[in-house]
Amino acid sequence: MNEYRFNAMGCEVVVRGGRADEQREVEQLFRDRDRTFSRFIPGSELNRVNEASGRPILVSGLFADTLAVALQVARETDGLVDPTLGAALEAAGYTRDFSELIADPRPAGPACGPRPVGLIGRIVRVPEGAILDLNGVVKSLAVDDALALLS
């Protein structure tokens, strides 16, 4: 079975199977999602949403759909998956791509809880002071979409 490897979204992605052109499409899909949802890429759509803190902002359909899934997963897990924990991640030192981080012996900060995020259609309002981090959900959905690309 052929294997294709690349790094995206702070991790190594391994694609087993599919044609070479499909594997490249999978890589492009992951890179596109990273450009849209990364906290570490200036100008990403996620960063524009976070910078609008407290104000409504129009987002892409992909962003709105992904946020809707993240909010649903937060409800279904009683907040174990929390798309609003970006501020807590930053307070813990997660301020750049995981591959660039060094070990940090600081103790974990206080637990945070989900903050109410407004989503109506493609209009998002993140509460002032909250920072979205959709990374886990984005990776999961990217895998689902990648599987659909492979024959």
Language-model features and meaning:
Residues K139:
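Short, conserved phosphate/pyrophosphate- and ester-handling motifs at nucleotide-, phospho-/glycolipid
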Residues M1-N135, A148-S151:
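A contiguous, well-ordered beta/alpha segment that forms the leading edge of an enzyme domain
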